[in-house]
Amino acid sequence: MEWAAAATKAASWGMAVAAAAAADDAGPTMLSFAGPSSSSSSPDAAAAAAAAAAAALHDFSVRARPAAAAPATRRARGGSGGGGGGGGGAEACSVDGCRSDLSRCRDYHRRHKVCEAHAKTPVVVVAGQEQRFCQQCSRFHNLAEFDDGKKSCRKRLDGHNRRRRKPQHDALNPRSFLPYHQANQFSVYPQTFPIADQNADALMRPLDRHPPFSISFSGTFREPKQFPFMQDGGSGLGAARHDLLRPFSSPEDGANITTTRSACNGVPHGLDPECALSLLSSSLHPSPAAGISSATAPPQFAPSSFSRIAASSQAVTTAFASDGGSVAGDHVLVPAVTYEDPSQAMPFSWQV
């Protein structure tokens, strides 16, 4: 019992010494001092007391030091909080007498030190002067720098208006390139109406220039007449076609067809491809009795609804069609035409 009481006293004394050593930062010296004090007791009791004191010192160093450092951490946070409070004072609204908490406002208002209400107020007092917050500069300006009813200062509005008034959209406006746009009278698509060019006509036909005119077809019929090769069914017609399409086998076949050019003035025969040949014949085998008739139709000019058609020559081809007993023949006048810009007409007549 005495030994246990002594050990308890030594342990309590060692803890007290450890606490004092922690306060004075002399822990190791206290341990060296605690050893001789227990010389009156047994060696086992002294060893137990020393072990208890060492354990108590270890627990104190593990638990007490972080606990002592915690207030410093709190002070640092408090300092930051105080700094935040000071910063909150620095980030407070710049308007005199405004105590709005900017920590609940947007970052824009915190950065420019103005609350949301005073950012839109027409007149506020800042540092004893009546000012207004500019929406574009994000700063307070004197009232003289604002126009009536404007939320931005005059300097920023002038630059903004100059940028907006630049005529950039007119050069790139797609409506100006459309054919139906009335402001600009031009079109991307050119007009495709053909126009007669007198110079081009002179280059194509330097020896044969005639004023352009339209052609109208007019027929004069006395009575309907059937050709002999059309009355014997289909055999005569087929034979006639075959005979008309075959090449000339003798000079007599070619002698019955003649081409006259009454309007080709001064053009050589070899340079006139527009004189057509008519191969209408009444018999399969032409006879010498069949005459050759050449006629020239005088040009008759009349208005026409046909547009852009011109006759480059008035050459006609006359083919004699005989029914076997008559001497006078039936002839057809066929003008050779090309497509140009005409204003007058040339007749197409069928005479029987």
Swiss-Prot record:
Biased composition range(s): Gly residues: 78-88
Chief localization: nucleus
GO MF annotations in UniProt: DNA binding; zinc ion binding
Renumbered ranges of motif Bipartite nuclear localization signal: 150-166
Subcellular location: Nucleus
Entry note about domains: The SBP-type zinc finger is required for the binding to DNA.
Function of the protein: Trans-acting factor that binds specifically to the consensus nucleotide sequence 5'-TNCGTACAA-3'.
Protein name as annotated: Putative squamosa promoter-binding-like protein 19
Gene: SPL19
